[in-house]
Amino acid sequence: MSSSVEQKKGPTRQRKCGFCKSNRDKECGQLLISENQKVAAHHKCMLFSSALVSSHSDNESLGGFSIEDVQKEIKRGTKLMCSLCHCPGATIGCDVKTCHRTYHYHCALHDKAQIREKPSQGIYMVYCRKHKKTAHNSEADLEESFNEHELEPSSPKSKKKSRKGRPRKTNFKGLSEDTRSTSSHGTDEMESSSYRDRSPHRSSPSDTRPKCGFCHVGEEENQARGKLHIFNAKKAAAHYKCMLFSSGTVQLTTTSRAEFGDFDIKTVLQEIKRGKRMKCTLCSQPGATIGCEIKACVKTYHYHCGVQDKAKYIENMSRGIYKLYCKNHSGNDERDEEDEERESKSRGKVEIDQQQLTQQQLNGN
């Protein structure tokens, strides 16, 4: 009923994130909305939520997470009050086990929490301002360090901040410290670990399987993204589709096909390096080397994000055409094909005219 009311009001009322109840797209990433319009959530709010795990099913997903899981996490958040603003929806917990601080994503930023985000390694973690730590080589070292050294609580800077502990104590009254920790991270229904699998790109620390340099996942996505080709000498890997549509990769001819998915390995490595600076229009993660063919358009995607955002892929093997048009410009592909055909005919006509002119000059001599 609520969704129909929102649809009637339309322009006068914008959809808000189910976690932070705001429209803070700049801080929290793109606001993603399910096809049935019933679920809306910022990508960062989902990405860092403690109990969300990636979904590899064929069912509808939202930012790499199943709709059902997102709804469960939003429901769980109604019982979790933010350590900063004291409002519900705070599903992002400090990654130190004994800490029970929970946040909305934008509240974590405002409270000067440390955001650790390394998509290539599958790391999406938050440390509250009390437990911020730097200069660690690995996340395992970070957890071990926190377990060995109790950090002194920071002194309150103002009266306003000194009051923030009371609502948290009320919410967890009567619970043990271990119970508080698992409740804030949603691990009461799943096995507790210091390295929770909660993102579309996260893997366990012991998982050494190769992952695509573009989309940061492995062979589990081969069916949708093509075979994962591995180049052991350079410790590089990439899905076929991710390479095929990347703007700077060069596909080799049939007479000089290499083992790396028929692509020039140098161009693939260059694209992977370039992708580290290219953030996806949909998920805001690096590796988005597939750009819309319209020159004035700045949208870039991972292959699967382009599919999810309803971009249009043009794949013509006989002519070697592999292009993407974002959903705003998907109607331009037919006009683009016509332009190419006209250009091809024009080039052919110019070549014939040049041949005739050369022949006339020879006859004249």
UniProtKB/Swiss-Prot annotation:
Keywords: Acetylation, Centromere, Chromosome, DNA-binding, Isopeptide bond, Kinetochore, Metal-binding, Nucleus, Phosphoprotein, Repeat, Transcription, Transcription regulation, Ubl conjugation, Zinc, Zinc-finger
Compartment(s) where it occurs, according to its Swiss-Prot or TrEMBL record: Nucleus; Nucleus, Nucleolus; Chromosome, Centromere, Kinetochore
Chief localisation class: nucleus
Modified residues (N-acetylserine): S2
Zinc finger (C2HC pre-PHD-type): 14-52, 209-249
ZnF locations on chain (PHD-type): 80-132, 278-330
Stretches the record annotates as Extended PHD1 domain (ePHD1): 14-132
Motif (Nuclear localization signal) on chain: 13-16, 129-133
Residue location of crosslink Glycyl lysine isopeptide (Lys-Gly) (interchain with G-Cter in SUMO2): K173, K227
Superkingdom of the organism of origin: Eukaryota
Chain positions of motif Nucleolar localization signal: 157-169
Name of the protein: PHD finger protein 6
Protein source organism: Bos taurus
